């Protein structure tokens, strides 16, 4: 609001419009002086500050202003004023007086729809803090500070009162991330050395650079002009012959390129966390490119937002000659999928050397080469190479992490170069079903052997049971009935027959035991059976001796009884042999 409008309002309040309007707007005649001073202040806004303070430091007499807690000055009416003036204090709540510098765009309050008035009143004798504009929000990139001192430069020894050393204090209230006083000092010292360039990170003397650039915008000129952030890595030596292959456009190369770039970015993050370089603003703000120091091969890859019709071009450049690569086949090549044999390398040393042309071809092809491919040392068939030569490392692994060209397959004096067309991936080249079939077959053989062992044990148990039942039957058949022992002659006749029967069965029993021992061939079984047979023989020999003594005594009685008793013996043998059969 300009000064002319303020004067116009003052004239309206002083006219015949009524004291009510004046009281309603300004609360009393004393406000006229205030607004006249305000008009002067608005006109003299560009004048020097001391003049403004002198003009506003002398308010009209009879008026005392109280500064409320919110900075709004409430006028205090003197006792000489009327009661109507004191009653109009309720209407003064709509008048907001701002003390201090008023900036444009600040909220302005009006009363009852009237045009808002900015009141710039300087209160004398009262000093306020700096009310200048402050930056809104929190600067996340700004380093922390304690009382204006950067956090990494604060000396912990300068604190007189160290509350974390007090008994019962929780160290995590003062140090984050597991730091304590000593480790924090060491960390600050290391950060200072890194930022000053004094901290030297050891890097192996190799020259392989892998550049992974993220955030593709489609403009190759701008991408080339972007600054690159560098982090050093070590890479195993390359074992491939490298060249500049033509660009390959395939959807599989896009997918494998994205996964490889993701792996590279995750490994960079882990490396930064390990060496504490995540604090540097370059690594934190720029997605940038990553140069990996390795061998003399430079691999550049771009990953970002890809469209459906956009193809990824992978370029491999080499500074090394072919002879250097050929002489470096001592270590295995990097980035091979697990379980897949490197098809471009010679066979392992445990295989027989490749035969000459005069000898017969081997029955088993070398690992990684299909059956339709002629073995090394034999000339290939005339004409174009068979299609089985195509799925090599160039096609199956072309869009992987390294994308290096593979060596050609040497067969005799002819070397077949790899074709750059798409071909099946690594799992299709290696037939893993044979390995699983071998393991399954071996498990089946083991189960079959276990079943055979169980069957043998069952047969042995059955043989033992049969032998026991036979012995029981023999004892039952040869055991005398009460009717047999009617006379001494019959008792003698039975004992003589039992003696002959034992002698007859002894030979057959020994044969069966020998056959059983030869069939089982187990030490425990042999020991057990031999002890059983020995005890049986001892028992039988004792019985035979007792029978012979008894027979000698009976022979003295009568010769007639012997002759009479010798006749029914064959009959008894025939009758007893019939049920045995």
Curated annotation (Swiss-Prot):
Region described as Disordered: spans on this chain: 1-95, 211-282, 320-581
Annotated spans, Sufficient for interaction with PAPOLA: 1-110
Main location: nucleus
BP terms from Gene Ontology: mRNA processing; regulation of mRNA 3'-end processing
Biased composition regions of type Acidic residues, renumbered to the chain: 43-54, 80-94
Chain residue ranges for the region called Sufficient for interaction with CPSF1 and CSTF3: 428-581
Entry keyword set: mRNA processing, Nucleus, Phosphoprotein, RNA-binding
Residue numbers of Phosphotyrosine PTMs: 411
Listed Basic and acidic residues bias regions: 1-10, 32-42, 271-282, 439-479, 488-515
Region ranges (Sufficient for interaction with CPSF4): 136-219
Repeat found in the keyword field: no
Classification via InterPro entries: Fip1_dom (IPR007854), Pre-mRNA_3'-end_processing_reg (IPR051187)
Modified residues (Phosphoserine): 84, 86, 88, 280, 479, 483, 487, 541
Ranges for region Sufficient for interaction with AHCYL1: 478-535
Modified residues (Phosphothreonine): 481
Chain intervals for the UniProt region annotation (Arg/Asp/Glu-rich domain): 442-477
One annotated Gene Ontology cellular component of this protein: mRNA cleavage and polyadenylation specificity factor complex
Pfam families: Fip1
Positions with biased composition (Low complexity): 247-267
Region Necessary for stimulating PAPOLA activity, annotated ranges: 1-332
Described function: Component of the cleavage and polyadenylation specificity factor (CPSF) complex that plays a key role in pre-mRNA 3'-end formation, recognizing the AAUAAA signal sequence and interacting with poly(A) polymerase and other factors to bring about cleavage and poly(A) addition. FIP1L1 contributes to poly(A) site recognition and stimulates poly(A) addition. Binds to U-rich RNA sequence elements surrounding the poly(A) site. May act to tether poly(A) polymerase to the CPSF complex.
Family: Belongs to the FIP1 family.
PANTHER family hit by this protein: FIP1-LIKE 1 PROTEIN, PRE-MRNA 3'-END-PROCESSING FACTOR FIP1
Listed name of the protein: Pre-mRNA 3'-end-processing factor FIP1
């Amino acid at each position: 609001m300009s000064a002319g409008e303020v004067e116009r309002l003052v004239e309206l309040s002083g006219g015949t419009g009524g004291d009510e309007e004046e009281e309603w707007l300004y609360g009393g005649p004393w406000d006229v002086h205030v607004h006249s001073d305000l008009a002067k202040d608005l006109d003299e806004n560009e004048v020097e500050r001391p003049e403004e303070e002198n003009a506003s430091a002398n308010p009209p007499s009879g008026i005392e202003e109280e500064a409320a807690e919110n900075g709004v000055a409430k006028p205090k009416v003197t006792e000489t004023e009327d009661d109507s003036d004191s009653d109009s204090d309720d209407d003064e709540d709509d008048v907001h007086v701002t003390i201090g510098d008023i900036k444009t765009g600040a909220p302005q309050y009006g009363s009852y729809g009237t045009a808002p008035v900015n009141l710039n009143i300087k209160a004398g004798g009262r000093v306020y803090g700096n009310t200048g504009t402050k930056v809104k929000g929190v600067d996340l990139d700004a380093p922390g500070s304690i009382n204006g001192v950067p956090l990494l430069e604060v000396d912990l020894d300068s604190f007189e009162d160290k509350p974390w050393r007090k008994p019962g204090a929780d160290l995590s209230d003062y140090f984050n991330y597991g730091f304590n006083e000593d480790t924090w000092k060491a960390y600050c010292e290391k950060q200072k050395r890194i930022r000053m360039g004094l901290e030297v990170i050891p890097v192996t003397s190799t020259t392989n650079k892998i550049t992974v650039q993220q955030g593709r915008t489609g403009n190759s000129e701008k991408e080339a002009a972007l600054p690159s952030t560098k982090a050093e890595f070590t890479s195993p030596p390359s074992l491939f012959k490298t060249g500049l292959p033509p660009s390959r456009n395939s959807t599989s190369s896009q997918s494998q390129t994205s996964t490889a770039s993701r792996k590279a970015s995750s490994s960079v993050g882990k490396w930064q966390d390990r060496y504490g370089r995540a604090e540097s603003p370059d690594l934190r703000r720029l997605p940038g490119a990553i140069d990996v120091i390795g061998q003399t091969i430079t691999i550049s890859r771009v990953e970002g937002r890809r469209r459906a019709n956009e193809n990824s071009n992978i370029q491999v450049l080499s500074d090394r000659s072919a002879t250097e690569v050929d002489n470096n086949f001592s270590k295995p090549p990097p980035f091979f999928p697990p379980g897949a044999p490197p098809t471009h390398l010679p066979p392992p040393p445990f295989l027989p050397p490749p035969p000459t042309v005069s000898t017969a071809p081997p029955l088993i092809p070398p690992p990684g080469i299909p059956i339709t491919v002629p073995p090394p040392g034999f000339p290939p068939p005339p004409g174009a190479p068979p299609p089985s030569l195509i799925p090599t490392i160039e096609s199956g692994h072309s869009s992987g992490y390294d994308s290096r060209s593979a060596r050609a397959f040497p067969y005799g004096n002819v070397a077949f170069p790899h074709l750059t067309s798409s071909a099946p991936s690594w799992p299709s080249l290696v037939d893993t079903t044979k390995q699983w079939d071998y393991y399954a077959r071996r498990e089946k053989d083991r189960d079959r052997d276990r079943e055979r062992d169980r069957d043998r044990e069952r047969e042995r148990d059955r043989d033992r049971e049969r032998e026991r039942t036979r012995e029981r039957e023999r004892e039952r058949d040869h055991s005398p009935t009460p009717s047999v022992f009617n006379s001494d002659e019959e008792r003698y006749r039975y004992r003589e027959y039992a003696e002959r029967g034992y002698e007859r069965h002894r030979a057959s029993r020994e044969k069966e035991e020998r056959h059983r021992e030869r069939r089982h061939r187990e030490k425990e079984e042999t020991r057990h059976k031999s002890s059983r047979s020995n005890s049986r023989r001892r028992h039988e020999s004792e019985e035979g001796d007792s029978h012979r003594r008894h027979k000698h005594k009976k022979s003295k009685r009568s010769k007639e009884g012997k002759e009479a008793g010798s006749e029914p013996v064959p009959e008894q043998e025939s009758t007893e042999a019939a049920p045995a059969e």
